[in-house]
Amino acid sequence: MAISKTEKDNIIKEYATHEGDTGSVEVQVALLTADINNLTDHMKSHKHDHHSYVGLLKKIGHRRNLLRYLENNDINRYRELIKKLGLRR
């Protein structure tokens, strides 16, 4: 269910704003999006897994807060990230 280390490293390389960047908003949102997509696929086949569902909702809320922060502080980075990830906002 969790993303593998190689997947995580690839996402960090793709969305990092500078070398060694693992904590920028873009990287955090990209990692959360990968987790959310994995959990969404899991929930399609395990409809009664309520514990995972609660975790999914928490991750969605965390991503929403990070996106709201980015939207309020740097709208151009926000728009670029939304387009790159293919999110509907």
From Swiss-Prot:
Molecular-function GO term, any one: structural constituent of ribosome
Example of a GO biological process term: translation
GO cellular component: cytosolic small ribosomal subunit
Matches recorded under Gene3D superfamilies: 6.10.250.3130, S15/NS1, RNA-binding
Keywords, comma-separated and alphabetical: Ribonucleoprotein, Ribosomal protein, RNA-binding, rRNA-binding
Family matches, as SUPFAM superfamilies: S15/NS1 RNA-binding domain (SSF47060)
Coiled coil: none
Record bears the keyword Ribonucleoprotein: yes
Highest taxon, organism lineage: Bacteria
Quaternary structure and partners: Part of the 30S ribosomal subunit. Forms a bridge to the 50S subunit in the 70S ribosome, contacting the 23S rRNA.
Database matches in PANTHER family: RIBOSOMAL PROTEIN S15, BACTERIAL AND ORGANELLAR, SMALL RIBOSOMAL SUBUNIT PROTEIN US15M
Family, as annotated: Belongs to the universal ribosomal protein uS15 family.
Purpose of the protein: One of the primary rRNA binding proteins, it binds directly to 16S rRNA where it helps nucleate assembly of the platform of the 30S subunit by binding and bridging several RNA helices of the 16S rRNA. Forms an intersubunit bridge (bridge B4) with the 23S rRNA of the 50S subunit in the ribosome.
Name of the protein in its database record: Small ribosomal subunit protein uS15
Organism of derivation: Lactobacillus helveticus (strain DPC 4571)
